Amino acid sequence: MGGIKKFKKGEKGENLKFITRNEAVKKLQISLKIFRKLCILKGIHPRDPKKKFKGKHKTYYYSKDIKYLQNEKVLEIIRARKVFKDREKKLINKKQFGALKNLKENRPMITLDHIIKERYPTFQDALKDLDDCLSLIHLFANMDASAKVRENQILACERLAREFQYYIIQSKSLRKVFVSVKGVYYQADVMGETITWITPLNYLSKKEKEVDYGVMISFLEFYQALMKFVNYRLFTSIGLTYPPTIDDAKLRKCDSLINIFESKPQQQTKTNNTTKKSKSTTAAAAATTPVDPKLKKLEEKISKINSKEEKEIKEQIVEEDTNMLQVNSSGISKDFEDLVGNESDNIPKIMDVTTLFKGFHFYISREVPRHMLEFVILSFGGRVSFPGSGDKVKEVNQSITHQIVDRSNSVKVHNTREYIQPQWVFDSVNSKLLLPYSEYTIGVIPPAHLSPFVEYEEDSYIPARKQALDALINSKEFADAKINTNAEQDDDNDNDNDNRKQVDSDGESDDEDDEDLEHLETRYTEELRKEQSKKRKSSEVDDDDEEEEDGEEDGEEEEEEEDGEEESESESESEQVAKPVLTKKQRDELNKQKQAEEDTKLAELMIRKKDKWIYNKVKETNQQRATANQTLLEKRNKVESGKDVNGNVKVAPQPKKPAPLVKKSQQKQQQASKKQKK
């Protein structure tokens, strides 16, 4: 008879899937510090089981992960290091310095190559996990040396960060930049993967006691090994040698990125010569040595396979050439030239963003943060120079087209260049066009620096600056768009006149602007006329059927409409006379009030339905308080003006007549007479 199979305790169940941290440490026979380091290197994280059998306040791991750690090579090297330390102590006590020197040469070293290959089987997987790696390396590159963080680690991080930046400059793969309080956010497209990382701002970093630097350094060791692999692959993909030759003296002086590196593209001629020499040497060696018949057969088979592969590759190339479209000089296929015709000028041309600053020479002043601006400008095709750079370009040089300044007082103005604030560089990179200089000149408060990582929806709130930038981007030649910082000030005549007087960033003159405006006005009037004519035609068709019936009524209505129009004209004239001219302060106050009302409306929309009753209660109480305060103020004003609380005029009270003065002796006599009468 078959029955239910019973298991002993410890053979099956969810309890066996998990293991506590103390049990894992005992099983591996290592300290807690080494266990943490191993988990960080191997990517093993603590788990949260549904039923915590051995206590709620304990950390649990998968038992499979701990078994996986038992066969790790790093564990063997750690145990070998313990033995090495014991031998070192013995040799020091015995004063055998020769043997000690040989022992130090054979010291066991930890290598992380096999761990990186296990965790990232493909290069795309490594690129996906590069965000945290770059952020941590840039953080340690900007730190100061201390007892917890060594100088060698800081220099290695700085070198790796500069290598990655140099690759991005050469490949021109930077796309977005955003400066915030936390730091500077960058985003780049590297081999089809979007990588975003943050670099800290230049400040004196304080070592906080709450931070566990041991855990951070163990992460850093792994990320340094990963970054070397990634940089090697990226450099070789462009044709650069790795590791590149870096001038350490220039790196310590904080010289420019291009001057620090001396790496050149790999010369194909040298490689071809070396391959030819190697082939000739191998052929000579093969001629002298006796050849086995088996080896000959193998060589013949390999040559046949190679010839087949070459034929297949050639056939594929021929097919691709036949399938490729023959493109015209204007970028249009020859098959579709007839369809396009004369309207080829209206086709929008795609702008190459990587050459946004091509032909511009930027001079960065001393007060401006140089490293991030240099990185951004160079990655978009510009040229950079600054005081103390290797170029030896002075501020007076006439080749400089733009000077980035953050102080308005200490600047000698040159008429041959544009003076801009650092924000212009970041905003023009994010908007993918050169913004007008008038908003970023010296002494002017620049517009809002919007985040390029936020995607605005149609239903959500869109800032006024974003709307203005969209209008600039969507316009044909970036001339018809007008930038208004406040969308509600469009009706003000002063702002319209100022915008008309401003010169466009493309260098167009005032006459050309007037011609464009006239052209737009004529187009607008023509469209209005067409619409009005369509409406009239439709109304005439409907009115022809009803003319006979409603002839008399139409006459009366026309008379009433004329009377109403005369009254409305008189009212509008009176309103124009009565309306006072508002000052700028009053306009600003009105705009602030409108903005506050819009903000409250948006906040009300964002509140959840569950929490809306609380908001309504608070709103009612605030309104009651406001009304009570207003009534008290009104009563106080009435009392101060000499009225009652109800608003009635107070009657002044008549003064009482003073009682006649009576002496004390007379009072006593009067009292005595009263007593006698009684």
Swiss-Prot record:
The keyword Cell cycle does not apply. One of its GO terms (molecular function) is RNA binding. One of its GO terms (biological process) is maturation of 5.8S rRNA from tricistronic rRNA transcript (SSU-rRNA, 5.8S rRNA, LSU-rRNA). Its main location: nucleus. Residues 505-518, 541-574 have a biased composition (Acidic residues). Residues 265-289, 485-601, 626-678 are annotated as: Disordered. Residues 519-531, 585-601, 633-643 have a biased composition (Basic and acidic residues). HAMAP family: Pescadillo (MF_03028). Belongs to the pescadillo family. SUPFAM superfamilies: BRCT domain. Keywords: Coiled coil, Nucleus, Ribosome biogenesis, rRNA processing. It comes from the Eukaryota. CDD domains: BRCT_pescadillo_like. This is Pescadillo homolog. The keyword rRNA processing applies. GO terms for cellular component: nucleoplasm; PeBoW complex; preribosome, large subunit precursor. InterPro entries: BRCT_dom, BRCT_dom_sf, PES. It is found in: Nucleus, Nucleolus; Nucleus, Nucleoplasm. Residues 352-442 form the BRCT domain. Required for maturation of ribosomal RNAs and formation of the large ribosomal subunit. PROSITE patterns: BRCT.
